[in-house]
């Protein structure tokens, strides 16, 4: 059932939720101009461009956010957020405030999107800067012209965009904070739900249900091989039988058709030749870049965005300093600036020739939901061709940069021109068609490799010279069996495409959505494909039953539209939040009532008898999947692995260390493990993270257990590669040193992504312990190895 938010905007003068206060900061006429950005890499690039009159500092991201342990939203007071300063970045805040007091003026140069606008607004609050003053500068590429132009034209912070980001943050907090405890009661403690992530999980679960319900249907195709008088052979495919579409359902029908075709030669009844133009695709948006990076480079969306961030913020190039190589990477626009069009057209003509330059620039249509606030993703300077940067960029950086470079150049090149030949053959009652393609002019495809052309099936075989009325001899005919296929499982590329098509999320949210549903164990990857877990199905079923409106695809897309309207000043924060809350609060109240009534009724009772107390055991769910538990808990705490009796014993490739037999997979209450069917030996499963080893680029990082029982993550090619880290790695890289990032769990159970390189300036430093007892502790013998994203520094692990 589609839920609608009804919002009437009557007042044209809308007051922002950002609020106002009296600002007292006094500028220091003798100080420098202070510019604040998010990252040290970006700061370094901009400071090189502007020179010694400017000081550029990094905020290291958000310095204020909603509190971790409370809701942090005053629902009764117009949904006012209650922000707190980041305790872990207290030193950053202190330093920025100190430098602000010494500065002549302050320019906030955070990213040119809603998230960046919100960071600038939070900085204005911390630094006592009036957000309505000309303090905000924005640019879409980090190049000298763009930076200098931005500095000359500062503007007030766009409070509408701040409100739009604030609305997204508060919506997600309300859903997560209210839904998660409800899920704990229904399934198990520790589960969490998200507004957009739940919809993405739903799409994957519903696709899996379609696949499971699908029943394949057999069909056959028939192909004949013919020879001309000049003894040249070609293939033709059966299209019609007795003037009707050919439908062959089984082997017997296929054999009958094959025999019929072989009885006589065929006459060529028509030959048509058609010239076709194939135009290049538009330059990359965030979505299309992520899709191509998955399909062509085998990069995950998180890794793609991390690499793109590095290319945008700047790379040290000998003789040129720190250079931003691409435009801003979070965009839904395919637009190219007039200045870059003036540069790329002469470049194409000079490098590839006049024939490859179209008469006028190629212009691409806007997407229906495109905000068109930024340009497309493109190189910033055509001086830096990929082959010039091979010694400067890491392997993965270069691969992504080359992808962006080629896509941009191709988008402004002439189309490919080909000639398609279609010949129709008649053999008795059987009609066959032969097709061939000849490329007359390669156009933009001159940039594509042979491998890429094969991936896209661009080249079809040529046909020999064929003439109407001529007879050709049949040398062979054969049938081929096929079965209709179910819809494919989602990959990262296809899920991102679907989310974009359905209006769910925006360029900045695709990668976090995919990362979140995997971290929460709602879906897993088999190869490149997403497969929902038991817990993913369970949570999705519950949310669809009790929160049909909130996890509706249409409702989620509608909310995105309202967030856009807030950013454009066409709706207010308060009204959108109220419209959402009216829907959500009703569903939450109903869910609490109904779920309490039906919880016991919904319990799945098994046929397995508890050997300790004689009760029928019930099927329960944990983060590791289904298991059997005694209903008389806590008086009886018996649990067992869950088996339906329908599972086939899954044999692994792992040999038992004791007897050499092939081990089989078993499911325990704490997850899957290996068991020898002969001698009973148990063994833990080595878990592949799917993340490419950043040191050797050949193996994957896998989860292992050290001799002392501690888990760590090392290269699957060990001992050939000794890359290892203690904490769980993610497909994201440090913007300062390029090392892989890892998840660090703090004492308050909160996760934080940190650089794994202890020598990096962003790596959290341990406080010095002065106690005598601490100094006497034995030092670890764990070997430490180093490897960055391009074979640089990494912290070792594994003893």
Which residues does each PLM region occupy?
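Basic, low-complexity terminal or inter-domain segments flanking catalytic cores
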Residues: 2-34, 44-47, 52-54, 126, ...
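Intrinsically disordered, low-complexity regulatory segments
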Residues: 2-169, 360, 460, 478
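Phosphate-backbone binding and catalysis cores of DNA-processing enzymes
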Residues: 27, 48, 95-273, 379-433, ...
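Conserved short loop/turn motifs at secondary-structure junctions
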Residues: 31, 111-113, 188-192, 273-282, ...
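Short acidic, hydrophobic short linear motifs in intrinsically disordered regions
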Residues: 268-271, 279-293, 320-329, 486-498
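Short, positively charged loop/turn segments that connect secondary-structure elements
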Residues: 294-304, 316-331, 486, 500-512
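Short, hydrophobic-biased segments on the C-terminal half of alpha helices
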Residues: 305-309, 514-515
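A short, conserved structural fragment
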Residues: 312-327, 520-529
